[in-house]
Amino acid sequence: MKRNTRKIAIIGTGLVGSSCAYSIVNQGICEELLLIDINHERAVGEAMDLSHCINFTNTRTKVYAGSYEDCKDMDIVIITAGPAPKPGQSRLDTLGASAKIMESVVGGVMESGFDGIFLLASNPVDIITYQVWKLSGLPRNRVIGTGTSLDSSRLRTILSEMLHVDPRSIHGYSLGEHGDSQMVAWSHVTVGGKPILQILEEKKDQFGEIDLDEIVEKTAKAGWEIYKRKGTTYYGIGNSLAYIASSIFNDDYRVIAVSAILDGEYGEYDLCTGVPAIITRDGIKEIVELNLTEDEESRFAKSNDILRDYMKTIGY
């Protein structure tokens, strides 16, 4: 990827794509922002609206609508296109429809001569990220999904409300599927550098008996709690995409829980799942392998097995 440019394309200008675009423009993450949608006029409208807010920011981002052909010079292509789950469905239930969309999208982007980084949010994001890797032929470090980045943020928010601590002082990750089977590596969750398991043990009088499984379930179901109230989620995932894109351009070696293709890490091969990874200008610099407990390894493996079973339904 060229290191003297900052150009991003967003494919899909629905609520997630437009929220991501808004975050990118407000933060001045890129110099050029290309919007692509099956409804071209929708993309044109979003580009116009975003351009009109430039005077109220400290940045100058060129925002315009275009087509796949324009992706040739992009550094990052963000894909948010895909169907939203209907009531009662899981993210995995949208796989068939999402997979068909990706075949068209990735084919169009790659035909342009694109040679940058794919950043995915389309659900089920772990499997779709794997599919895009296969379809694109790009190195695995340059195909990244949002994975459990948002889940990890939700986890920290839930813990911060429980412990009365700023969520930015809490460190830890949800791993595995961005969905119902995700797990938390509790042995690596810290608050101000102190293990949370130690804190909960020492302060039982203050916090009582905390059911960690309930916290995991609350984290995994957070999206559905939002869905029940407003129909879908977009601010959190939009900001997650912008955050990852910023980390790529800034080459800041930030550790983020993303969908990454494993090739021996955690003893897994030919699988895309949510794991912490070091993000740089080249994409994923390194996958961080946490030393999981036996119970955590088992939960992580179960989540990965679910992903593998669904991968088979689209030929992988």
Curated annotation (Swiss-Prot):
What activates or inhibits this protein? Allosterically activated by fructose 1,6-bisphosphate (FBP).
* Domain of life, source organism: Bacteria
Its subcellular locations are: Cytoplasm
Q: What is its EC number?
A: 1.1.1.27
Do you know which Pfam families this protein is assigned to?
A: Ldh_1_C, Ldh_1_N
Q: Which GO terms describe its molecular function?
A: L-lactate dehydrogenase activity
Cell membrane as UniProt keyword: no
- Cellular compartments per GO CC: cytoplasm
Which residues hold substrate?
R91, N123, P124, V125, D126, D151, S152, S153, R154, T233
Q: Which residues bind NAD(+)?
A: V16, D37, R42, Y68, S104, A121, S122, N123, T146
UniProt keywords, alphabetically: Allosteric enzyme, Cytoplasm, NAD, Oxidoreductase
UniProt KW Oxidoreductase keyword: yes
Q: Where is the active site?
A: H178 (proton acceptor)
**Which CDD domains does the UniProt entry name for this protein?**
HicDH_like (cd05291)
Q: One biological process GO term for this chain? A: lactate metabolic process
Per the record, the similarity remark reads: Belongs to the LDH/MDH superfamily. LDH family.
The role this protein plays is: Catalyzes the conversion of lactate to pyruvate.
Tell me which NCBIfam families the record gives. L-LDH-NAD, PRK00066.1, PRK06223.1
For this entry, the protein name equals L-lactate dehydrogenase 3
Q: Which organism is it from?
A: Bacillus cereus (strain ATCC 10987 / NRS 248)
Q: Which gene encodes it?
A: ldh3
